[in-house]
Amino acid sequence: MAQESPKNSAAEIPVTSNGEVDDAHEHGYNRDLKHSLPSGLGLSETQITSHGFDSTKEGVTEAGAPQGSSAPPLPCVLSPSRVAASKLTQQAGDLTVPAGGQRTHTKGGPVILADEIKNPAMEKLELVRKWSLNTYKCTRQIISEKLGRGSRTVDLELEAQIDILRDNKKKYENILKLAQTLSTQLFQMVHTQKQLGDAFADLSLKSLELHEEFGYNADTQKLLAKNGETLLGAINFFIASVNTLVNKTIEDTLMTVKQYENARVEYDAYRTDLEELNLGPRDANTLPKIEQSQHLFQIHKEKYDKMRSDVSVKLKFLEENKVKVLRNQLVLFHSAVAAYFAGNQKQLELTLKQFHVRLKTPGVDAPSWLEEQ
């Protein structure tokens, strides 16, 4: 430690009334000094020195023994100093932390992080802007087509298949509605036949003179009710199969058709924009717009071609599945109705067994899918 003359090294050591060093002042100053430094800047990174004979010695002072003394030197003591704290605060304020984590000196100001953080609000705003622009283009295209001013891309063969599918769906929905009405009426008739059979059976027991007559009618009504329940099971199975075909299989295909039509509108909208730009002048301002429009047109053209291919494949598989399902269900419906009105109970039961139709026993819950495996 460099020795200075007594004239320049007036050590300031606060002491108590007992002659001991006042540690409370030292700890309080160190705490204030740490609070005044920015995060990451330690005491080891700061230096306070005195220059000149007449400069004010505040902050760091050296307390040492006089020259020639055998006593060991006293350690450095930090005494509270507002001037030193203000200087350290100014030095710390001139530091910024760049992206690499290194500190560089600036003129002053708060600590700034150079890493760019993506703003979620800006990303959402950009998505909304793109969606609004796309919606505007598609709406303009639809209005132009309805007014007869714009052109639209048409696949005649595919459009004809889609129209037939929609027309068939309406007809199948009508058949489904009528079959449900028949099932409801048949259920009420079977319920009435059961009640009538029970009434005949009760009267056959109480009327000895008409015992046989009431008994025959009771047996007939019970047999009709039993056959009606069998026919009702076949009709309900027919309804369930047609309902799955109409409201799930066909509906799924029509959802794909809807996506195809939306892709067609977008394709025509961006095609129209590209055609309008190509008809205009070509200069330094319009060429970037034409290139961007060409890029967007190509993207929507690929999307349109893909959706058209998907619709064609789905229509093909739907037609095959529809023929297979409806053929089996129509044969079941015809055989069950014919056997019921012919009074052929064995043929009616054989028909249900042939098509794997299970009748629900009254008072017994249907088995779960695990029990059916």
UniProtKB/Swiss-Prot annotation:
Q: Where is this region: Disordered?
A: 1-47
What does the UniProt entry say about where the protein is found? Golgi apparatus; Golgi apparatus, trans-Golgi network membrane
In terms of SMART domains, this protein maps to: Arfaptin
Q: Which Pfam families match?
A: Arfaptin (PF06456)
What spans are recorded as compositionally biased (Basic and acidic residues)?
22-35
Which residues does the record list as N-acetylalanine (modified residue)?
A: A2
Q: Which GO terms describe its biological process?
A: intracellular protein transport; negative regulation of retrograde transport, endosome to Golgi; regulation of protein secretion
- Residues found modified as Phosphothreonine: T361
Predominant localisation class: Golgi
Phosphoserine: modified positions: S5, S36, S39, S69, S79, S132
Which keywords label this protein?
Acetylation, Golgi apparatus, Membrane, Phosphoprotein
- Which modifications occur after translation, per UniProt? Phosphorylated by PRKD1; phosphorylation delocalizes ARFIP1 from the Golgi and disrupts its ability to inhibit the activity of ADP-ribosylation factor, an important component of the vesicle scission machinery.
Q: Which GO terms describe its cellular component?
A: cytosol; Golgi membrane; trans-Golgi network membrane
Molecular function in Gene Ontology: phosphatidylinositol-4-phosphate binding; protein domain specific binding
Q: List the disulfide bonds.
A: none
AH domain location: 153-353
Quaternary structure and partners: Forms homodimers or heterodimers with ARFIP2. Interacts with non-myristoylated GTP-bound ARF3, but not to GDP-bound ARF3. Interacts with ARF1. Binds with lower affinity to ARF5 and with very little affinity to ARF6. Interacts with ARL1. Interacts with ATG9A.
Give a short account of what the protein does.
Plays a role in controlling biogenesis of secretory granules at the trans-Golgi network. Mechanistically, binds ARF-GTP at the neck of a growing secretory granule precursor and forms a protective scaffold. Once the granule precursor has been completely loaded, active PRKD1 phosphorylates ARFIP1 and releases it from ARFs. In turn, ARFs induce fission. Through this mechanism, ensures proper secretory granule formation at the Golgi of pancreatic beta cells.
Listed PANTHER family? ARFAPTIN-1, ARFAPTIN-RELATED
The molecule here is called: Arfaptin-1
Q: Which organism is it from?
A: Mus musculus (Mouse)
Per UniProt, what is the name of the gene that codes for the protein in this document? Arfip1
